[in-house]
């Protein structure tokens, strides 16, 4: 199953020097930063999710401006998405998995996304899909619900938190069939790559790390279990397990029990 990963930039280190003579040299403006994350292959060399490189570019204010995802084997561009910022608003344009993407996002006074209207058009067939995502937050600034509206149908996801950790999400279909529950157990690794926003966000979960989707969990999950219900009876369960290594307070690697592994390369970020 394809996993949508998000990557959090670490705090930049500010170096100061002292001198008896006053230095009137102006402080240089920060420059845009790029960081790349490489997704590896399983131990047997069989590609699971594709040999993919993810590159994230940020502006001088450390805001995400571009996501570039490309397969290394054949140089196929999976995603190339651009972000433009204005007061209380983000515009998104680009391509994602064979679709032209446009989206308009509304932010509240805390910089959290409250609504996204998204349109995707197939580059081969012209098929068009229009969706609206509505987001709510609890008193602690954590995501409480997301509602996806498409062709008049609504699908709501509810998030359950305990002690600052996301423990489960519940997806209510509004019918007797297809309700889903995602449940998580936590690890000791810091939350720098997230799984819980997959398919809830219009393919731009990376904005989570700018605070656009509220407060992050404290730690990464050690397990992620998906259970599908029909008429209240569980009919399918799939569990993924994750093992991490951390270097200098940052994620270095993530190994999944299904065989896929990820290596993280970090740029100097705010």
Label each PLM-derived region with a short phrase.
Residues 1-4, 20:
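Positively charged n-region of N-terminal signal peptides that target proteins for export
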Residues 5-9:
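Sec-dependent signal peptide hydrophobic core
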Residues 14-17:
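C-terminal motif of bacterial Sec signal peptides marking the signal peptidase cleavage site
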Residues 21-270:
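Buried hydrophobic residues that stabilize the cores of well-folded domains
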